């Protein structure tokens, strides 16, 4: 049987990230990004071995953009596409694994819109567009939240009145589940440790950041909660703040909920602390030049990350390793070094040369001799979504 091809789609409100995944190839035959969807500036960027190309598609909606993308995908797949895997942000309590998409499962995704009002409608737009364009192809939903459905109740419940959970689903769900699942399994493979007898601390650090405790291939706790705002300091998100901050800002400054929500999600984090940028690469340069805001943002980011990792360790029976992934986790040797300096009780020590070497997609162990294992493992959510899609096709 020839190697199969899966198209992976990640739809945002005004964007579509896509990748063609061939099960036998390490690199993607075609990938790209459609951005500014619905506006006169809408454009699709394609990238393949042949090079890069951008195509303007003024005012295209999700379906019109996908109609431009899919013929190129089919061509790159040699005319044979086997299925489509969709990233879906929120599966609530209904979806604890990836699932084939049909009328029933689509209704379940729609029922969770109140839990992800920005993301799930965008995900559904992409799903409906793909189904309209390729009604005969099997399509699969892969949920950011599904991996964390194995968390015990004492880890996912908030200490608020029970009725809020039972009637309104107010609980911790966690996100980045596809990345945490892929990376923890890959770490076990690289370390030669059985997945079903392993315990990992995973730090997914990008513009969004979260930690996760993974035991025997299952999530036992994670730093994000009801929404992706809970937990670590992120690019533009505050992470944990005093819940009374909303009341304080309303009474003191007269801010309404929408303004506070926008500030915490889009104006805070590294951007808010530094007054400069949400990009750790920009802050790294500014920090070297002595920019006070960049120095502060870096220090708060690393300390809060270390604090979260220490908290996640409560869910582990043992520690087989700490794993860094995501754009910052994979590329910032300085963040890794500073974070571990805050975790002295764990006995972590880095091999400076190995730490410096593991950037730009290089995986490996970076601990010094005698230290607990520390690894850098590049994430690959697109491949994990494709693997889930193939598994359901084989079921």
UniProtKB/Swiss-Prot annotation:
ATP binds at residues 17, 204-208, 279-281, 327-331. It catalyses: acetate + ATP = acetyl phosphate + ADP. PROSITE patterns: ACETATE_KINASE_1. One of its GO terms (cellular component) is cytosol. It comes from the Bacteria. One of its GO terms (biological process) is acetate metabolic process. It holds the Pfam family Acetate_kinase. This is Acetate kinase.
